[in-house]
Amino acid sequence: MIVPDRHDPRTVGDATWAVHGGNAVDGGSGAIRTPIIMANAYLLPDDPSGIDWSNPEQLLYTRTTGANQQALEAKLAAMDGGAAAAVFASGVAALHGVFFCFLASGDHAIVSDVAYEATWRLFTELLPAKYGIEATFVDTSDLDAVRSALRPNTRLIHTEVIANPTTRVADISELAGIAHNAGAVL
């Protein structure tokens, strides 16, 4: 019999892990549940010259990161068995984060021809004009069309499942294989 350990996801159910995963005792209050911090700025030293402003773990200002955001990211990572997670203020912000993380000038992306309007605009207006990133729009449920759209500089395949409004469903597992074999991400 396995003894439940709230710090080990292999020993507890999903619901228990959703409650306990990613939690740590709060150093300031001793709370065993992550407190909600109602702050948008944090105390800085009198001489801020030693601050590493690019350190994503350092609590400086909530537009960069905050205690609540870090707690949510830790919980999501724990629930998914990942090393880390990132949360964004909106879906479009998340798309920007993914695309700018994996694409650079001269790269190519394959994008579902049925895409959220903001995704479409990113790949038809902003990314090609300002960053030199090209995109080919294809029916991502048609694996042969996806394979035909591959280029040596393809770095990303983006699909939406279930595509709205067509309700078209792409085969995620097959697309992941195509992307992996091409040295791209899905």
Question: What residue ranges belong to the model's regions?
Answer:
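Catalytic PLP-binding core of fold-type I/II PLP enzymes
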Residues: 151, 156, 169-186
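N-terminal "arm"/small-domain region of PLP-dependent enzymes with the aminotransferase-like
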Residues: 2-66, 74
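A glycine-rich helix N-cap at a beta->alpha junction
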Residues: 126-141
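Buried hydrophobic positions in well-ordered alpha/beta secondary-structure cores of metabolic enzymes
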Residues: 30, 76, 94, 109, ...
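Conserved PLP-anchoring active-site segment centered on the Schiff-base-forming lysine
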Residues: 101-119, 138-139
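Conserved N-terminal alpha-helix of the aminotransferase class I/II PLP-enzyme fold
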Residues: 41-96, 118-126
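Short helix-loop-beta connector
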Residues: 79-83, 103-106, 152
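Short, small-residue-enriched loops and turns at beta-alpha junctions
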Residues: 116-117, 143-145, 162-168
